[in-house]
């Protein structure tokens, strides 16, 4: 299973129909494929299939796809064009602004944010503002005005994140999660030390 990257996204478009299209795609869990579709020819596996005849066909199809699309299979296409290997949405976290020209949503993506797709959405007239946080690899960032600013959080304390990156911290509760994790570790250490002391005392009475 991948590390999950948390995403918060605001989309704007002058055409309410495009916002509704994005909303519907998110509800289906097909947001990225709606606007940056994977060619059907790329829906093949990567690597080995075992059977020699099938393997030869797979290798021929992969080579042809590389020549036509620049990618051998769906996985490489998604990582290259979307920025993440699976589609996003289907989490019931999307809302359209009453005027119909703005959408706010949150979702998880595999390993990384779909910043590659954001650039292509902008080419379709969307204005994109997004924040993301991946706790497993300790990075976060902001995508705005076509620029992706990734921030390395490794080694930063809860206080440092709270003061230096307040918007990201407010969005994802990063400092709170760090403090909760540290408190849990302290409780486990205290319990371990107490248990060890009790066992030592029992041995001395024998």
Which residues make up each language-model segment?
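Long, contiguous binding/interaction regions
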Residues: 1-206
